[in-house]
Amino acid sequence: MRIAVIGAMEEEVRILRDKLEQAETETVAGCEFTKGLLAGHEVILLKSGIGKVNAAMSTTILLEKYKPEKVINTGSAGGFHHSLNVGDVVISTEVRHHDVDVTAFNYEYGQVPGMPPGFKADEALVALAEKCMQAEENIQVVKGMIATGDSFMSDPNRVAAIRDKFEDLYAVEMEAAAVAQVCHQYEVPFVIIRALSDIAGKESNVSFDQFLDQAALHSTNFIVKVLEELK
């Protein structure tokens, strides 16, 4: 099976890249694509760059040029739910934009005109990720909504404003909704699997620097387990 894995930063893709066999890397429009073999699958590992525009552009190139059957977006995120801690893993059930507001024209908050209010992750991929998480003893793994915006959420006031909009939000980051929207338009199944590098609003910038590598390791190990179980 041909599976694409997307991470925004070098720290988020380095470990998985080192695990690929027969790896070949090429750069297209500033985006790094590495093809290789892992767990019996042909894997295309994309380093997309940070933010929604980079994520949307690179995911479009990925789907047009490499035509993966499924897409997994991995990396770090900021925890939003009160039950979460740094290092925990969140599996998306749904992804939304938290910085889109066209409510003046009767759209839901976060809804892009012409698109659904949120983008549902593939149920089979979510179920598979849930199955893999049952073996995790030292890391809390949960599933829920992830929201995306082009801002790092270190301001408590902004965090509070987003909490008011999305009561069931588990994590925030800067690429997933763009990846999900492109996958939705191409009708390619996707899931987002993110490990928490910080808790949004609680000295997030300090925590992010300290725990990015830990989050990257947790998310990568989880991705490998999913690939091993994927048939």
From Swiss-Prot:
The active site is at residues 12, 198. GO terms for molecular function: adenosylhomocysteine nucleosidase activity; methylthioadenosine nucleosidase activity. Substrate binds at residues 78, 153, 174-175. Keywords: Amino-acid biosynthesis, Hydrolase, Methionine biosynthesis. GO terms for biological process: L-methionine salvage from methylthioadenosine; L-methionine salvage from S-adenosylmethionine; nucleoside catabolic process. Belongs to the PNP/UDP phosphorylase family. MtnN subfamily. NCBIfam families: MTA_SAH-Nsdase, PRK05584.1. This is 5'-methylthioadenosine/S-adenosylhomocysteine nucleosidase. The gene is mtnN.
